[in-house]
């Protein structure tokens, strides 16, 4: 009887974990705005998904030892999960897809990112000068446009922007 009770408890706890929904997008953003106001930073929002290799690359680059402090000193970075497969829909932040649509980015691929002020006003996004999503910038041209956007929305110096450029540019 004891074993059945223990197994039942494990099953129920496992079910609760699977059923746990993600925070809605507005809550995630409100938390980021509050922190950014306190720290005098901008909000860097990245729309991503668990299956997205370029999303993982973007996060890895931003969290690299060379870049982490540079981004952390200038931005409150937050992630909104979108475009998950049917079996992983529970990973999505409710309202994130609507927010992606608001930025006219529903069909442009991910990662898609925006940089906002503490009131939620759009300062820049990941569209390049041709209207294409930079996503995780990797070519010299993409990284150049990314760095220009960072320069306009941060206090990063030329030397610091050069570090970001080196980390993001794919070496051939």
Residue positions per predicted region:
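Extracellular/periplasmic catalytic domains that process cell-envelope and extracellular macromolecules
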Residues: 37-38, 69-72, 105-109
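Non-catalytic, surface beta->alpha helical segment in thiol-disulfide oxidoreductase systems
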Residues: 102-158
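Short active-site neighborhood of thiol/selenol oxidoreductases, capturing the structured segment around
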Residues: 39-52, 77
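C-type cytochrome heme c attachment motif
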Residues: 50-57, 112-114
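Typically the conserved alpha-helix immediately C-terminal to a functionally engaged Cys/Sec
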Residues: 55-72
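Bacterial Sec-dependent N-terminal signal peptides
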Residues: 1-23
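Thiol-based oxidoreductase modules, predominantly thioredoxin-like and allied folds used
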Residues: 24-25, 68-96
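A short beta-strand-turn-helix
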Residues: 25-43
């Amino acid at each position: 009887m004891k074993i059945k009770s223990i197994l039942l408890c494990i099953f129920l706890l496992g079910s609760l974990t699977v059923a746990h929904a993600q925070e809605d997008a507005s809550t995630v953003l409100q938390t980021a705005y509050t922190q950014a106001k306190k720290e005098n930073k901008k909000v860097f929002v990245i729309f991503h998904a668990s299956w997205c290799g370029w999303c993982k690359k973007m996060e890895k680059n931003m969290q690299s030892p060379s870049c982490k402090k540079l981004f952390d000193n200038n931005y409150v970075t937050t992630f909104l999960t979108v475009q998950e497969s049917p079996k992983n829909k529970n990973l999505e932040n409710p309202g994130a897809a609507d927010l992606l649509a608001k930025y006219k980015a529903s069909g442009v691929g991910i990662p898609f990112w925006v940089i906002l002020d503490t009131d939620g006003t759009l300062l820049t996004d990941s569209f390049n000068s041709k209207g294409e999503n930079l996503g995780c910038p990797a070519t010299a041209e993409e990284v150049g446009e990314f760095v220009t956007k960072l320069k306009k929305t941060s206090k990063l110096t030329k030397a610091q922007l050069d570090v970001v450029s080196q980390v993001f540019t794919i070496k051939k």
